Each structure stands twice: as C-alpha cells, then as structure tokens.
From Swiss-Prot:
It catalyses: (R)-pantothenate + ATP = (R)-4'-phosphopantothenate + ADP + H(+). It comes from Gloeobacter violaceus (strain ATCC 29082 / PCC 7421). The lineage of its organism: Bacteria, Bacillati, Cyanobacteriota, Cyanophyceae, Gloeobacterales. Homodimer. One of its GO terms (molecular function) is metal ion binding. GO terms for biological process: coenzyme A biosynthetic process. Catalyzes the phosphorylation of pantothenate (Pan), the first step in CoA biosynthesis. This is Type III pantothenate kinase. One of its GO terms (cellular component) is cytoplasm. Its EC number is 2.7.1.33. K(+) binds at residue 103. Gene3D superfamilies: 3.30.420.40. Substrate binds at residues 77, 81-84, 159.
Length: 229
C-alpha cells in the first residue's frame, strides 16, 4: 500500500492506494500530522502548492516529492500550480478530453486541456470562503459569515444572508457563464468540479458541472506516479 499526499493552501489530503485503487482518504488542516501513517506506507508520493510544508516529508527515505516537470502535461508554464496540472491529467485519464477542471479551494482555479490533452489555459479567483473572510477583514461593519447549507435567497433581508447571496450566487453565476463559453469553444468537452467546496456546490447546483470528483487531485498523483514507474 502506498500513500498519495496532496498539500493545499490550508488543508492536506491523504489517499491510500493499493496499486491504482484508492482505498482510504483523510483530510485535515496543514498543522496536523499523523506520525503513524507514513510508516504504514511502502511509498509516499507528495504534491504541494507550497514548499513551506515539505520539510518533514523530505526526511522520509521512502517519500518522493513531485514537481511540475514530473507531470505528463504539455503546454504548461513554469509557475502553473502542480495541483492544477495533476487535476488535468486525472480528468483526462478518467473522463477524457477536452476537459475543464474547476477546483473549489482557498482559491477557485479553472484549468483546461484541449482535445489532444494539452494545457490550454484557465483562470483564478478567490475561493468562496476566502471572499467571505475578506469582507469581514477589510470592512468595518460586515460580520463573519459561513457558507450557507441551503441555496441562499436571491434578495436577502439580513446582512448575513446578503453576503451569502452575493458571494455564492454571483460567483457561481460567473462560473456558469465561463463554463458556457468554454462549452461553445470545446463542444463535447467535459467539466469537472473538485476541491473542498465542490460537494456543497454540487448540492446547490447539481447540473452546473458534468462530474463532481472530490479526490481528483489524488488520482492525478497516482497517474503521475504510474507514469514515472
């Protein structure tokens, strides 16, 4: 059994694989460390959007740190986040091309491959939770607000609900327009949602994306590791 580790901006995600079969996952804050878990894995493959949290992994002799050059994706640029590249090779492997992956994390990233599996660009904007925290941090009177569980009302009658409506409805309306434009440019392409907020977005708008795949990045690590063997 081997361990895939996806380190994001605020959380880390672990997936235990037997060969290419994902058998168990864990998700927790970056500050948490399960000292027993790495010892139970025959091999560890780590991908991180930042170098800050890699030091402890580098001390493990059976751990391999993935770089962008290890990801079999053409057309990339040097500062492309490895998570975006891994998402794309995972989507291409699991669902085919063209593909557009929207990753709902601290940032919302949209990344696309064409019909030949080549990276062809994308977009980045603040994540839903990041937008909510920014309003609290950068204004004098707006309160801290969590993401709503039900779909927020269009015309809210409280400040909290108005913030939720603005962040959620307007952000997802913009994403829907982006997806529509991409579908016109790439007819027959598949859109995939992943990331921490993707399950909630799927509950709100189940038809917005063709596929919701919580563990897409972990599968991308598996594809990259498989290609390197």
């Amino acid at each position: 059994m081997w361990l895939a580790v996806n380190i994001g901006n605020s959380r880390q995600h672990w997936g235990w694989f037997t060969g290419t079969k994902l058998v168990r996952t864990l998700d927790f804050p970056l500050t948490h460390w399960d000292a027993q878990a790495p010892d139970a894995a025959e091999q560890i493959v780590v991908a991180s959007v930042t170098t800050t949290h890699l030091e402890r992994w580098r001390t493990l002799p059976h751990a391999r740190i993935l770089n962008l050059a290890d990801v079999p994706l053409s057309g990339t640029y040097p500062t492309l986040g490895i998570d975006r590249a891994l998402n794309l090779i995972a989507a291409a492997d699991a669902y085919g091309c063209p593909a557009l992956v929207t990753d709902f994390g601290t940032a919302i990233t949209l990344s696309a491959v064409d019909e030949f599996g080549r990276f062809c660009g994308g977009a980045i904007l603040p994540g839903l939770g990041t937008q909510l925290r920014a309003l609290e941090h950068f204004t004098a009177a707006l309160p801290a607000v969590d993401l709503p569980e039900p779909w927020p009302p269009l015309l809210a009658r409280t400040t909290q609900a108005a913030i939720q409506s603005g962040v959620v409805r307007v952000t997802l309306a913009g994403l829907a327009q982006f997806l529509e434009s991409w579908k016109r440019q790439y007819p027959g392409g598949i859109s995939v949602a992943t990331g921490g907020d993707s399950e909630r977005v799927h509950r709100w708008l189940p038809d917005l994306f063709d596929v919701q795949d919580t563990h897409l990045t972990l599968w991308g690590i598996c594809v990259a590791a498989r290609g390197a063997d």
